[in-house]
Structures are given as structure tokens and as C-alpha cells.
Amino acid sequence: MTPDLLWAPFGEFAFMRRALLGGVALACSAGPLGVFLILRRMSLMGDAIAHGILPGAALAFWLFGLSLPALTAGGLVAGLGMAGAAAWVTRRTGLREDASLAALYPISLASGVLLLGLAGRKLDLLHLLFGSALAVDTATLYGMLGTALFSLAVLALSYRALALDSLDPLFLRSISRFGPLAHAAFLTLVVLNLVIGFQAIGALMVVGLMMLPAAAARFWSRRLLILLPLAALIGAVCVWLGLVLSFYASLPSGPCIVLLAGAFYLFSLVAGPVNGLLRSTPFPITV
């Protein structure tokens, strides 16, 4: 495939340019968040919250139709509510947070599907779960760009607190009272990116764009300051190539993007210089 073929769809079609800009913006903010989720051993939280936003989005659709602000607000409230409920259960019962999320997300998913059925209005459930990056309109694009800029700004301003909270939360709590605040801000960013992403590539596919580049980057560096931009870069390249593959092969865009990210993860798992299968010496992550 020549370089012209790789860029031609974006020069010719406005919807391809919107899909590329929105997807790259989402990759640049979701990838670093995925790195922190892996460091916190909360990798499945993204998947659980992605299911958890469905009832909020379904209720918003029932009440307001296909309104971007309503869907965003509904998904955000549902996602934050689910994360807060899981944290409350953990504090009150001692159950691990991932176990609490695993118990809550099937309830949320079933509630969302039931609400869509009760609404009696036509909305393709597959589109809600798997989305279409090629259907990104101008309003959604602005939402994705704004979310990415906000997320990156918060990550830059709170990097030290997030790094300490991920690598040694007890130490952070011993020297500062802002440990719970950093954790809450991080969860808010995760939910916000999942909510804005599900409108473009679906509630389930956005988890792949958040976690797979982060997991792949883990095999190429052990420094956190390198892992964060590397995950964003891997995600952005996968968005670009996935959209090109989707365009020429007439395939769904979301799965193409995620499968390319998965292929690079498998390659990194085998050939990565840090803890890859071809290496015998493990390396810890350092700040």
C-alpha cells in the first residue's frame, strides 16, 4: 500500500477527517489513562464502567432522543454512580473494588438493555455497543477534542499525585491529604473518556482503545514518563490505520481499530524488549 493510499481517504472525505481527528484525540487521552489503570491493577475497571454507562445513556435517549449533551450527561452520571457505588461497597464490606465492579456491571448492562426496550424508540443496540467512528459529526468531534484537552491538562497538572497514588498509595496518604481527591479525579477522567468515546466507536470498543495501547507500551519501556506518550502514539497510529483498513475493505471501523491495537499488543508481548516473551529478565516500572 502506497503512502498516497494511506492518506487519500482523509483528503477526499470530510467524514474520514472527522473520524481521524476524533479518534486520535480519544487515543491521546485514553491511552495514558489506560497506563494508570494497569499500574493500579484496575485493568478491568474500564470494561466494567463501559457497561455501567449504558443505563444512563439509555435513559437519556428515552427522555431526550439522540441528543449529544443528554447522552453525555446520562452516561457520565451512570458511570460515576457505578464507580462510586463500587467504592462504597468496598469501604463498607472489605470486598475488593474489582469484585464490586464485576458484580455491578452486569446489573447495569441488563438495566440499560431493559430501558432501551421500554423506551419503544428505535436505537440500534449494536451501534451503542460497537459504534461507528465514520459517523462522528461536528458536535461529537468538538466533544472529543474538548475531552482530550481537558484530560491531558488534568493529567499534566496532577501527574505526581497520580503517579504516587498508582505506585505507592499508602505513601501518598502519609504525606498528603489529597490521595482520595487524586483517585476521584482519575476515575472521573476515565468515565468521561469512556462516555465521549462510546458515542464514536461504541461502549465496548472504546475500552480496547484505552487498554490495548497501554498494555502494548508496557513491553517497550519501564519509565512512566515514556509509557504515557507511547500509549497515546500507539493508539493514534492504530486509529489511523484502522480507519484506512475500514475504508478500503468496507469493514466496521471500531473493530478494525481495536483489532490492529490487539495485533500490536501481541507483537509487543512476544518481541518487546521489556518483559517480552523473548526476554528472560523482568524490569519494574519506574517514574
Language-model features: locations:
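Loop-to-transmembrane alpha-helix initiation sites
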Residues: 22, 68-77, 98-102, 145, ...
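Helix-loop-helix "hairpin" substructures at the membrane interface of multi-pass membrane proteins
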Residues: 140-213
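Membrane-interface helix termini and inter-helical loops of multi-pass transporters
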Residues: 2-12, 122-136, 244-247
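Transmembrane alpha-helical segments in multi-pass inner-membrane proteins
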Residues: 204-255
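Membrane-interfacial amphipathic/re-entrant helices at transmembrane-helix boundaries
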Residues: 1-28
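Small-residue-rich segments of transmembrane alpha-helices in multi-pass membrane proteins
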Residues: 51-60, 103-115, 135-136, 179-190, ...
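Cytosolic-side transmembrane-helix boundaries in multi-pass membrane proteins
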Residues: 251-287
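Short loop segments and helix-boundary regions at transmembrane helix junctions
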Residues: 35-50, 54-122, 217-229, 246-249, ...
